Amino acid sequence: EAYDMVYNGFEFSEKTGEPILMRMVTRLAHSRSGVERKEQKPQNSISFSEDPRQFILLPGNARKRYKVLLARQDEFIKASEESPYNKYIDGPNKKLGIVACGIGYNYLMENYPEGCEYPVLKIGQYPLPKKQLLQLVESCDEILVLEDGQPFVEKHLKGYLGIGIKVKGRLD
């Protein structure tokens, strides 16, 4: 899946004109898997950017660029909500909702080979998908965040939700 994410990430970058980042966490960096190679794409033609300052993020450029990115945030959230890498999987037990990020999702599913009894939101693309997050939060009593490395998503959720729902994770 990580291979496909990079492949599709480059397409997304070309479409939006924005760079993409592949967040390599420890567990992913130390794992191996067979991949099915995709068809190689033809080389892009080389051309100069209309605004090369978008790639030179000195403080003066970064402040202006930040405004542009904020204006496009809804577009990025919509792409995240429609991404095949973010998906909501319903479960019968609504006492707990699980947000599983990246390889944390694989570890969760290894422990539930017959399917997880709790609703799970698999996160593989950012920004966080609002629609799926609200679906999980509105149907569950509390949220558990599974992520590798720093508690990035957990911090985001605690600030983003702000509605009194309990969020558990590394910060507990």
What label would you give each PLM region?
Residues 2-172:
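Flexible, low-complexity linker and terminal segments
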